[in-house]
């Protein structure tokens, strides 16, 4: 093994920024998440709304990718994507998904499990037109998850559409939209010294959230 690679793989550190106690937790995991999200924002962590979305295909092969959190309330979170994408095809066959927020700078991570469902088109349309015009055009320029021969094909298509819609409203793409994830489980992880981390899991039983400490 290369010496530099070996050094990288053997490198570790102590997690000593904070701790997490049960009496600090909110009754609802999404309310707790909002607190941590605000603290992540104050810490100036880049891309705090980036979350790793996990899905499974029809052969039980798991996939992960980054998507952006765009809405949250006490029951659900929402993200947007192309309905012809790989992730959308997975969700069509299996609505069970996972969401992971890795906030390493704070020695924290949050894991959500839940079920994905398309949101109403009126809500999708409303959000679509809050995006920048270039972002609206990019939806039309990219056939997401499809193989392309070279980058210039994508760039040329974007520039062509940008010119076409220079003085026009970009049409709403019916093949694009949002998913709400109804949360069924949530785990909060806070790194601690000696790898004795704090972990708490929320499980919904009979419409009520129950909180349990997990061994690290």
UniProtKB/Swiss-Prot annotation:
HAMAP family attached to this UniProt entry? PdxH (MF_01629)
Entry EC number(s): 1.4.3.5
**Name the UniProt record assigns to this protein:** Pyridoxine/pyridoxamine 5'-phosphate oxidase
Keyword presence, Nucleotide-binding: no
Question: Is the keyword Ribonucleoprotein in the record?
Answer: no
| Species assigned in the record | Wigglesworthia glossinidia brevipalpis
Which residues span the membrane?
A: none
Cofactors that this protein relies on: FMN
């Amino acid at each position: 093994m290369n010496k530099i690679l070996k050094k990288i793989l053997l490198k570790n550190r102590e997690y000593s920024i904070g701790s997490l106690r049960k009496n600090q937790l909110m009754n609802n995991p999404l309310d707790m998440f909002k607190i941590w999200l605000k603290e992540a924002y104050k810490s100036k962590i880049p891309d705090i709304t980036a979350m790793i979305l996990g899905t499974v295909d029809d052969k039980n092969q798991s996939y992960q990718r980054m998507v952006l959190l765009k809405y949250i309330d006490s029951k659900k979170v929402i993200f947007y994507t192309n309905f012809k994408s790989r992730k959308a095809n997975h969700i069509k066959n299996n609505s069970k998904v996972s969401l992971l927020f890795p906030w390493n700078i704070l020695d924290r991570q949050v894991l959500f499990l839940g079920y994905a469902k398309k949101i109403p088109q009126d809500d999708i349309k409303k959000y679509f037109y809050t995006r920048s015009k270039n972002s609206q055009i990019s939806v039309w320029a990219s056939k997401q998850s499809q193989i392309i021969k070279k980058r210039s094909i994508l760039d040329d298509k974007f520039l062509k559409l940008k010119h076409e819609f220079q003085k026009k409203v970009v049409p709403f793409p019916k093949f694009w939209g949002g998913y709400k994830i109804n949360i069924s489980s949530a785990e909060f992880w806070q790194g601690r010294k000696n790898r004795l981390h704090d972990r708490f899991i929320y499980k919904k039983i009979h419409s009520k959230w129950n909180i349990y400490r997990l061994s690290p």
